[in-house]
Amino acid sequence: AGKTTFFDLISGFQDSDDGKVILNNKNITKSQSYTIARLGMVRTFQLTKVFDRMTVLENMMFSASKVDNDSFIKSLVKPPSQKNKEIDIKEKSFEIMKNLNIGHMANSYARELSGGQKKLLELGRSIINDPEILLLDEPLAGVNPKLAEEILEIILNLSKNGISILMVEHNIEAVMKISERVIVFAEVKVIADDI
């Protein structure tokens, strides 16, 4: 229907053939995804993208480092001058993991997580840099009903804390439960708006 493509276009993961993407009065149409993330719009993916050979904590800290334009090596091994920044990132990572109920898995490798726990990790990685806009691509796909309820509660809390959320989701009941506005896509067209 074009929902994920829409997210790809507005988050810089795919170039558009036509039209413009405006974020805070700035044309970001041809911007790279990392530039858009620095401007405050981040996303999750339908298929989780975590670093399986890193711990849950390392995944979180790496995500915080990348937005600061650190190189890959610097984001893994910080020089002594950045020790305080690293401590702050670590504390924030633990706080987020605790709030997402994955704090007890901080030292586990991401590959050891269940699919639902990987969804939580990806959500945590997406919010560690305090985004203004969060794009969630099927956050409930493949998770059990109990975890789906937990994720919905987390999404509601993020929204209450001032994060604007755009969500692609097939679970209509869940969408209606937490959304202020619903837009329905079919065959790359909007077929309903503000239902």
Q: For the regions a protein language model found, what residue spans apply to each?
A:
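Conserved ABC transporter NBD signature motif
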Residues: 19-26, 38-39, 192
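Conserved ABC ATPase "signature" region
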Residues: 72-105, 153-156
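Conserved ABC ATPase signature
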Residues: 109-113
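Conserved catalytic motifs of ABC-family nucleotide-binding domains
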Residues: 130
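Catalytic Walker B motif of ABC-type/P-loop ATPase nucleotide-binding domains
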Residues: 134-138
